Amino acid sequence: MASIGLCMIVRNAASTLERCLTSVLPLIDYACIVDTGSDDETVRVVRHFFQKHRIRHDIYRDTWRDFSSNRNAAMDWMRHRGDVDYYMVLAADDVVCFSEAFDVHKFKEQMGFDVYDAQVHEDGAQCDRPVLFEANLGCYYRGKIHEFLVIPAHATRCEVTAFHLESTRGPSDRDRAAYLSDAGVIEEALREETDPFMLSRYHFYLGQSYMRGGDFKKAIKAFYARVQCGGWEQELFISLLCIARMMAGLNYREERVIHAYFRAWSVCPERAEPLYDLAAYARKNKHHHWARLFAGKGMQLEKPTRGLRIEHDIYTYKLLEEYVNAAYGCGDYSESLEACTRLLKQAALPASERGRAMTSAINALERLRSV
């Protein structure tokens, strides 16, 4: 049966760390935790937790340099252990969520792939991330910030369905100054970097940092720089989608906003996020027939099984919500009521939205009765 070692770098994570460790406890046989300069109770929390649960562990202290350097150093310490078959790398604000049918012994007995990718849910979006990899595979991290795992081309990979990760480090958990600080780190990295791939990646995350820091004009410029680099279509799609959303937020001319959304959609026509946004944008501008067209087209698309930052709610109920409103705005109350009935049958519809859906259904019904 394969053994799994948890590898983490932490700093000032006392308030969130125990939740992460509790969630991953069923999987791990050993833990290597590297503290990079905490001035809170992080180290005490780690030591107490693993002693309480009788998990073999080592706690190291390291000077902070950057994310990839410190993660690679932590993995070097892990390599001192000869009894760990797989490394599992998590952040302190990750939570492992197991399916009800998960059998840890069966899972470990059947482990044979080099790398296991898990779905990550963060801030309403989903993507995949390698979370388990074979100890002797030679993986390492790159990137001063928003680091990523470099995996040998010959590695065999498998997508884990028995568990996924919930990341609690969404934009709302950090203030704007923190994101602008990240942007400063990335700007410095861009001045030093020469690798075209890393340059494209840094431009992408520079756009993300400025956007979340509230500097939309700099974010748009950074995302355009990412688009000019070419490459991975999913990253190009997200860059163009973010540009369109910020243009709408900054009240750019209507034709520019619509063109920006269409440009994003043309890169990944299997993605419905631009169509949802276009439907909502058209509704707000009282173009109800346009809204109906965009929402209807979006509803024809299945949620992709793989992709970068897939917005799950758009595919499960939000497009249908927009279609309800658009049909009503077009005066097609029968169609609006029928769509509303379908919406209320959706298990994914949050309780907070059901009242609004009921009101929409009542309004459509009253309109039909008055005809």
Label the predicted regions.
Residues C7-Y30:
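Short, well-formed alpha-helical segments that are part of the catalytic scaffolds
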Residues S23, L27, I33-V46, T63-W64, ...:
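A conserved acidic beta->alpha catalytic loop
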Residues R47-W77:
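Conserved donor nucleotide-binding strand/loop of the catalytic core
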Residues S68-D76, Y86-V89, D94-K221, A225, ...:
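Catalytic-site signature of metal-activated, phosphate-bearing donor transferases
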Residues T194-F197, G231-Q234, P269, K303, ...:
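Short coil turns that delineate tetratricopeptide repeat
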Residues Y205, C242, D277-A280, L319-E322, ...:
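"A position-specific structural signal for the A-helix of alpha-solenoid helical repeats
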Residues Y210, M247-A248, A282, A327, ...:
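Residue at a conserved register position within TPR or TPR-like alpha-solenoid repeats
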